[in-house]
Amino acid sequence: MTDQSPAPTAQDENRLIAERRAKLARLRETGVAFPNNFVPDAHAADLHARYDGLDQEALTAAAVTVKVAGRMMLKRVMGKASFATLQDGSGRIQIYLERGTLGEEAYAAFKQWDIGDIIAIEGPVFKTNKGELSVHANSARLLSKSLRPLPDKFHGVADQELRYRQRYVDLIMTDATRRTFEARSKAVGGIRQAMLNAGFLEVETPMLHPIPGGAAAKPFVTHHNALDMQMFLRIAPELYLKRLIVGGFERVFEINRNFRNEGVSPRHNPEFTMMEFYAAYADYRWLMDFTEDLIRQAAIAATGSAVLSYQDRELDLSQPFDRLTICEAILKYAEGYTQAQLDDPAFVRAELRKLGANVEGPPLARAGLGALQLALFEETAEAKLWRPTYIIDYPVEVSPLARASDTRDGITERFELFITGREIANGFSELNDPEDQAERFRAQVEAKDAGDEEAMYFDADYIRALEYGMPPTGGCGIGIDRLVMLLTDSPSIRDVILFPHLRRED
């Protein structure tokens, strides 16, 4: 036996909606169905912080009267007196209402209100006999009628897709969801403040690009009617931010959206938030140190600590991050390989074929040894990088915007940061040689012509900017959504995006 009632059916919900619409119709007849002349002067969390520690005698002596407003989440009518729970943006507070104080008419009106209604209460703060901090209603008003019943407290929003699709209901019902997005805001705020403290200038660059660039990705395409030209939602702000370095801003950053017309998964949303920053006279080693500290600051801002728990495993961001080359990571995390094998293109290609990779199609069909090693790393080692780890020294052929190493042929001064097996950041010493950059763009165009949809276009204006001279520069992009997943112990990227992309409802 159980005392939990079954979840309401669609027929029950339709009946409740009809009843609530009838109540709203009666309110409209009074001429004030949705009043807008009440301003609260207190929030639930503030009341608990100030008065939870006081006893009733002290509260009576303080004689504190407050005005609160929010959504009614619980209602218990007990004859001449009732209790309700009011939920505002900060938390919950109990409300006590009695007929003798409110009067017959106002108390009768309250009894007709429904769970989910937005209400306004004015009265003194007190404690019940059980010690519950409450507001004793001297007046009570209905501010906004809720026509749709909320999920009941026991069943909540059980359908995960419904939580994403109707995030407003999820936020009403689920404390953990609200905490996730509050933590996200704190993390972004912490990053922004750290960047400003380090002397970076926050900028905004175009969201519509005439040429997609700055990343290897498939763009969304649109048309600019006034200019009669094809445009692309930006896949990255990189080339515009580096134009600003050319223009004389020595440290810039941007926190904004990128758009990539690719798959949806627990790690990917086609619309996502990135923080990209560029610093003149910095290289990739400086970037790694700076990024490491920045992520710690974000963790502390969001959670109060740099030591976290993610999916029931400890995640320690307080210690120095590991740094491994692609081959070192394969040798450490994938079993059975030798350096000699990894240096043999035929062997690596055969291994990739065994693992199910399409080595005959783009981009691997034309790949050199470095790109093949990277593909093997992605197949065998990437998911095992639980500890924060920088993978460094990426091959030139997969790093068209990164500066080449002065000491190793075919290698760039580039890193990617992995935490819990996910890429969190990508950075490098920037290529500032315009002739080298033009040649790499041409190689990307050849790859695109050969069928690689994610290869870059040739951006002549960016080359022109480099020809004016760009100082030695380092730049990095941090995936805000994936970082927030770590900081909030969220298994899916959809859990940290307020309104993730979903298929249309039937």
Curated annotation (Swiss-Prot):
Similarity comment: family membership: Belongs to the class-II aminoacyl-tRNA synthetase family.
Recorded superkingdom: Bacteria
Keywords, sorted A to Z: Aminoacyl-tRNA synthetase, ATP-binding, Cytoplasm, Ligase, Magnesium, Metal-binding, Nucleotide-binding, Protein biosynthesis
Pfam families: tRNA-synt_2, tRNA_anti-codon
The protein's name: Lysine--tRNA ligase
Name of encoding gene: lysS
HAMAP family with a match to the protein in the record: Lys_tRNA_synth_class2
Lineage, broadest ranks: Bacteria, Pseudomonadati, Pseudomonadota, Betaproteobacteria, Burkholderiales
Reactions catalysed: tRNA(Lys) + L-lysine + ATP = L-lysyl-tRNA(Lys) + AMP + diphosphate
Compartment(s) of residence: Cytoplasm
Cofactor binding comment, as recorded: Binds 3 Mg(2+) ions per subunit.
SUPFAM superfamilies: Class II aaRS and biotin synthetases, Nucleic acid-binding proteins
Transmembrane helix listed as a keyword: no
Main EC class the enzyme belongs to: ligase
InterPro entries listed in its UniProt record: Aa-tRNA-synt_II, aa-tRNA-synth_II, aa-tRNA-synth_II/BPL/LPL, Lys-tRNA-ligase_II, Lys-tRNA-ligase_II_N, Lys-tRNA-synth_II_C, NA-bd_OB-fold, NA-bd_OB_tRNA
